[in-house]
A protein has these predicted regions:
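The structured alpha-helical core of multi-pass membrane proteins
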Residues: 1-452
């Protein structure tokens, strides 16, 4: 990428040397006069001007891979300077040779450099695309941890960086979407409308979220945060307005993708909430369960049973089903709940909570940040070590509940098609045993049918 941006800078300098007067374009009065002279047509030109943001694509990286400082240093020392020089060079070329407007990038280079430049551009495209793909992986993982998407297989590609992940399902989806885009739009020019609308809306969302960060995390006053946000929104909304004219020319595509993703995420979130309410209907609390054990003690068998449940306030249905069918209970029962908090990381002192209800019944609540990975066997080893609750790995069985939804006419607050969509997402979700890295030979899954 250093070679790429250096090449852009050299190409720009070459053009500037042809027509040094292009540097006068840095004066904003030229832009103001242009808008005043051209009115609405001048405003719509912003939609084309906005495409200069494509130059920064190769710098893109989610903060799970690179920190704030490296990105700032790269931008101000290399990327920003190279892009400004290059766009000045293209402007100089168009002043000197207006007929070059159909392909100013390659015409800015010497003829002998055409094929090397095509090869370099291809490599830069691959690298820039890889950065975006990695960002999608990280965002998907965070959405899964926060409960907005079903569990998927997550492969860690680095032992040192927890943010470097690979998600096969997302990778295949991106591949098919990319092929469909190429076949459907046929050229990058036809994609300009889709790109402009997608990025301008993303910038507005980022600006609004920056206000929340400034208020809640940085402690800025409402006046200061609001003034900065409004200043950015003026420019963002201007670009969005110019790009709205391109909805019919490809701008519909990012809106369609956003609608599909939004529907999937909200359906999963709302469906899980309704399912949790169904599971809690008539459920026993740990205290009531222990009372029933004392009144009617079952046969106790050696070993430890770990029952995972998303709601720590009630007894998991899998435990009740196990007791009903086997007529026995392990001497030690651990009710394990894994919670993902809306922060990236949690301190060790906030991680674990262990409650002893008596009769060998314990509740372990484990909290993780959305950038952290839950490793249940490692967690239970830590519980044994720090909380003096012996959970020998070779003497522990994990019981998981697997719900099968029966779609009925019972009102749930969701449309029938969304109920069916949620049921399909449930069926195709990654197994909890694999997701939480449970040893396969020590897992028992108990199914339950639930009217939804």
């Amino acid at each position: 990428m250093l070679v790429w941006f250096s090449t852009l800078a050299l190409m720009g300098i070459r053009g500037i040397l042809w027509q040094p007067s292009v540097l006068f374009a840095i004066n904003p009065m030229h832009a103001i006069r242009f808008f005043m002279a051209n009115g609405m047509q001048g405003f719509l030109v912003l939609g084309a001007v906005f495409l200069v943001t494509t130059g920064g694509e190769a710098l893109y990286a989610d903060l799970g891979h690179f920190g704030e400082k490296p990105i700032q240093v790269d931008w101000f020392s290399i990327v920003g300077i190279s892009l400004v020089l290059h766009y000045f060079g293209q402007g100089a070329l168009l002043i000197r040779q207006p007929s070059a407007a159909h392909n100013p990038f390659y015409l800015l280079a010497p003829k002998w450099a055409l094929y090397p430049l095509v090869a370099l551009s291809t490599m830069a495209t691959v690298i820039a695309s890889q950065a975006i793909i990695s960002g999608v992986f990280s965002l998907t993982r965070q959405a899964i941890q926060l409960g907005y998407l079903p569990r998927m297989e997550i492969v860690h590609t680095s032992r040192a960086e927890i943010g470097q992940v690979y998600i096969p399902t997302v990778n295949w989806a991106l591949m098919f979407a990319t092929i469909a885009l190429v076949i459907g739009f046929r050229s990058s020019t036809n994609l300009a409308g889709a790109y402009g609308l997608a990025v301008s809306m993303t910038m507005i969302i980022t600006t609004v979220l920056a206000y929340v960060v400034a208020r809640d995390l940085l402690g800025w006053s409402a006046l200061t945060a609001g003034a900065v946000t409004v200043a950015f929104l003026i420019g963002d909304l201007a670009f969005l307005g110019a790009n709205l004219a391109k909805i019919a020319d490809g701008g519909w595509f990012p809106l369609l993708v956003a609608a599909v993703v939004f529907t999937l995420m909200t359906t999963w979130r709302q469906g899980r909430r309704i399912l949790n309410l169904r599971l809690r209907e008539g459920a026993l609390t740990p205290e009531d369960f222990v009372k029933s054990l004392r009144g009617h003690p079952p046969v106790r068998v050696p070993g430890t049973a770990v029952f995972m449940h998303r709601s720590g306030g009630v007894i998991p249905p899998a435990l009740l089903h196990s007791l009903k069918h086997y007529k026995a209970l392990h001497k030690q029962v651990v009710l394990l709940t894994v919670l993902t908090e809306e922060v990236s990381h949690l301190g060790d002192d906030e991680r674990l909570q262990v409650d002893d209800f008596g009769e060998g019944i314990y509740r372990v609540t484990c909290r993780y940040g959305y950038m952290e990975e839950a490793d249940i066997p490692a967690l239970l080893e830590r519980v044994s070590r720090e909380r003096h609750l012996a959970i020998p790995p070779m003497d522990t069985t994990y019981f998981l509940g697997r719900e099968s939804l029966i779609i009925t006419s019972r009102p749930s607050g969701m449309a029938m098609w969304r109920e069916k969509l949620f049921a399909s997402m449930m069926r195709n979700a990654e197994s909890a045993a694999r997701f939480f890295r449970l040893p396969p030979n020590r897992v028992v899954e108990l199914g339950a049918q639930i009217e939804f």
